[in-house]
Amino acid sequence: GQVSVSNDAGSQIKVDTFPKQELVESIKVDGPITFERYVREYFKDDPILAEIAMCESTFRQYNSDGAVLTGRVNKSDVGVMQINKYYHLERAEKSGFDLNTIVGNMAYAKKLYKSEGTKPWNASSKCWRKFANRENETLDIES
């Protein structure tokens, strides 16, 4: 199935869903929601991941031309959570996650966070670290 989500510019984005990737069922609103709100709701149990998404991609999964967002420094980093395909593509696919979709990218990030904490996103920690400290999150930041 698909769900429509509005980005901050007011454009509608189609979000694909897959059997192994669950959408947030608790988002119940009368009108369109922003993609930021969708991400924050998805990560409501691990709010540091929403802050990481803001720092990594400014809450974007796709470029304005519709292509999956890739990293500015490392083109292997993809999507809203900037998951590095070199390190994670095989594991993500074996687990049933498609990193090129919004739901797959966020669901894999949640799985990665459960096993490795914030370490995979240490490169952007200067941006989100203050939120982790405020939320009493455990940090695994290499100096």
Regions found by a protein language model. Give the residues of each.
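N-terminal secretion targeting segments of exported proteins
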Residues: 1-16
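Catalytic glycan-binding domains that act on GlcNAc-containing polysaccharides
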Residues: 16-143
